[in-house]
UniProtKB/Swiss-Prot annotation:
Pfam families: ACAS_N, AMP-binding, AMP-binding_C. Mg(2+) binds at residues 537, 539, 542. Belongs to the ATP-dependent AMP-binding enzyme family. CoA binds at residues 189-192, 311, 335, 523, 584. This is Acetyl-coenzyme A synthetase. Its EC number is 6.2.1.1. The keyword Hydrolase does not apply. The lineage of its organism: Bacteria, Pseudomonadati, Pseudomonadota, Alphaproteobacteria, Hyphomicrobiales. GO terms for cellular component: cytosol. It catalyses: acetate + ATP + CoA = acetyl-CoA + AMP + diphosphate. Disulfide bonds: none annotated.
Length: 652
């Protein structure tokens, strides 16, 4: 375990917004008097009607979370209109296409026009405040316009990652009963077309079978590829936006009106619609963006995430735009046309702040230093990581090779549910330890508890909970508040349970050790084991499946599947490939199984519960200490699992 410390350097300290003394003072104020602290910082956004109530939250009983509840504001207004007078000509988005020769810049004035036109199109077709609009888009500016246009008129957006399958998209349309979809003819990733419109058509068909009718589909022309067309339902984006005015007044929204739903994986099979609201979310996204990245006006900021994930919501669109920043949006992938693409983009657009995932770092590290060295990267001032813990070796490579040992790394821990950074270094305030997310952001009160719920003091290892609310926190699971209470507040009464394990060292630094529930973290993306299991079991030859994670050198966690076949069905490599294809079709490519082991049975207790602990150990090629297997209904199953494991160290 790395305990090497990289102290804050003089040049970083000299220009930092927050130094150590200020961090300690503000942090103390934020936890001792949250009403006063957030009452002040809530004013970083503009309000049509100022709030008088700041915090009204309870983690017990029915669980209710309200911030700034009597204030009126609008997210789109805060991200665009209020900047126009002083910064209308500032670039809001730099868009870098999949093709390295194609890019464009969109100023705040232009953004205003694009968003207002799209908002007027939505209104013209009957979209009203509170209606749910599904956005299934590639990384093109229109994806951000769509989010902001919804926010402008009070519609609730549900962005679905363009890598998800039609089945996954259909399920999300049904869950929030969305009747309007915004998509694209095709996406482009690594030179390959992605059939988004075709997927949308299939998803709408799936939704219709569950009695949810999509009435309109607005289609952006990206590639000009051939697509199916339903006259009366399907509309071309470029035709519709040309017919409406370029002005649309923002709707006055209550702070607790819904802003968006974003589906994330849970430990049960059905994805959860995480609901974020208007005021608290924007205050928190903007404040974390400014202080975590030490953002100064004029900085060029690039987060490599996709808008289909929360990182894209908070740190490509809402946080940066609320701060009048220039945000780079990249359509492509890190290894196209070659493994130097990220570094070429940094030079091309003079990027100052670069925020990416450990998976990308590990894979580019494996490609060799020469791809990095051929670029200058001299504009870089700050590096960030997000999505999963970063191993110290990758951290050091990122720091030394990519950042030339002069750019601090902010290793940010947070979740879809938290809306913004929770535990993170602040560049001018926090000495860095490779692999540690370091210290809590303002207002965040982490605690470690043991399995009985006892709070652990000092250096300790335990389950990470948050003791009190913060403005960016999700408010509920869409349409299922009971599930919200059960998932997050029932394990440790009166505390928000993160689902992560964590170690706190003697300096009070936090080290995230990974999920403690049945959720996988694959390449920084969350996937429920139950989702993958139900995809496998839906195949006609599969009788039962159990899925666990195992250490993977690039993705962090790989997906290891134990599959029991129907009687009389033989396992084969061809069937393995067929099952991989089947899971990709059901969920999407991110859920592709890495290893599939056919097994006559699974280790179950006499009550029928699968003992996942044993499956995890075998998947990790570590079966010397399987613990007590005497409670198993059929202990012989374990010997078969060990003998036929797919990841023997010598086979690697």
């Amino acid at each position: 375990m790395s305990e090497k410390i990289h102290p804050v350097t003089k040049p970083v300290k000299a220009r930092a917004l927050i130094d150590q003394a200020k961090y300690q003072k503000w942090y103390r104020q934020s936890v001792e008097d949250p009403d006063k602290f957030w009452g002040k910082h809530g004013q970083r956004i503009d309000w049509f009607k100022p709030y008088t109530k700041v915090k009204n939250t309870s983690f017990t009983g029915k669980v209710s979370i309200k911030w700034f509840e009597d204030g009126l504001t609008n997210v789109s207004y805060n991200c665009i209109d209020r900047h126009l007078k002083k910064h209308g000509d500032r670039v809001a988005f730099i868009w870098e296409g999949d093709n390295p020769y194609i890019d464009k810049k969109v100023t705040y004035n232009e953004l205003y026009e694009h968003v207002c036109r799209l908002a007027n199109v939505l209104k013209k077709h009957g979209v009203k405040k509170g209606d749910r609009v599904t956005i299934y888009m590639p990384m093109i500016p229109e994806a951000a316009y769509a989010m902001l246009a919804c926010a402008r008129i009070g519609a609730v957006h549900s962005v679905v990652f363009g890598g998800f399958s039609p089945e996954a998209l259909g399920g999300r349309i049904v869950d929030c009963q969305s009747t309007f979809v915004i998509t694209c003819d095709e996406g482009l990733r690594g030179g390959k077309p992605i059939p988004l419109k075709e997927n949308t058509d299939t998803a709408i068909h799936i939704a219709a079978k569950q009695f949810v009718t999509v009435e309109k589909v607005l289609v952006v022309r990206r590639t000009g590829g051939k697509t199916g067309w339903a006259p009366g339902r399907d509309l071309w984006y470029h035709e519709e936006t040309a017919k409406v005015k370029a002005d649309c007044p923002p709707v006055k929204m209550k702070a607790e009106d819904p802003l968006f739903i974003l589906y994330t994986s849970g430990s049960t099979g059905k994805p959860k619609g995480v609901l974020h609201t208007t005021g608290g979310y924007l205050v928190y996204a903007a404040m974390t963006h400014e202080y975590t990245f030490d953002y100064h006006p004029g900085d060029i900021y690039w987060c490599t995430a996709d808008v289909g994930w929360v990182t894209g919501h908070s740190y490509i669109v809402y946080g940066p735009l609320a701060n009048a920043a220039t945000s780079l949006m990249f359509e492509g992938v890190p290894n196209y046309p070659d493994q130097g693409r990220f570094w070429d983009i940094i030079d091309k657009h003079k990027v100052n702040i670069f925020y990416t995932a450990p998976t990308a770092i590990r894979s580019l590290m494996g490609a060799g230093d020469h791809f990095v060295k051929r670029s200058s990267r001299s504009s870089l001032r700050l590096l960030g990581t997000v999505g999963e813990p970063i191993n110290p070796e990758a951290w050091e490579w990122y720091y030394k090779v990519v950042g030339d040992s002069r750019s601090p790394i902010v290793d940010t821990w947070w979740q879809t549910e938290t809306g913004g950074h929770m535990i993170t270094p602040l560049p001018g305030a926090t000495d860095l330890k490779p692999g540690s997310a370091t210290l809590p952001f303002f207002g965040v009160q982490p605690e470690l508890v043991d399995s009985e719920g006892k709070v652990l003091e000092g250096a300790a290892d335990g389950n990470l909970v948050i003791a009190d609310s913060w403005p960016g926190q999700m408010r509920t699971v869409y349409g299922d508040h009971e599930r919200f209470i059960q998932t997050y507040f029932s394990t440790y009464k009166g505390k928000y349970f993160t689902g992560d394990g964590c170690r706190r060292d003697e300096d009070g630094y936090y080290w995230i050790t990974g999920r403690v529930d049945d959720v996988l973290n694959v390449s920084g993306h969350r996937l429920g084991t139950a989702e993958v299991e139900s995809a496998l079991v839906s195949h006609k030859h599969v009788s039962e499946a159990a899925v666990v994670g195992y250490p993977h050198s690039i993705k962090g966690q790989g997906i290891y599947c134990y599959v029991t076949l129907m009687v009389g069905q033989e396992g084969s490599d061809a069937l393995r490939q067929e099952l991989v294809k089947h899971v990709r079709a059901e969920i999407g490519p991110i859920a592709s199984p890495d290893k599939i082991q056919f097994t006559p049975g699974l280790p179950k207790t006499r009550s029928g519960k699968i003992m996942r602990r044993i499956l995890r150990k075998i998947a990790e090629d570590d079966f010397g200490a399987l613990g007590d297997t005497s409670t198993l209904a059929d202990p012989a199953v374990v010997d078969d699992l060990i003998a036929n494991r797919q990841n023997k160290a010598d086979a690697a």
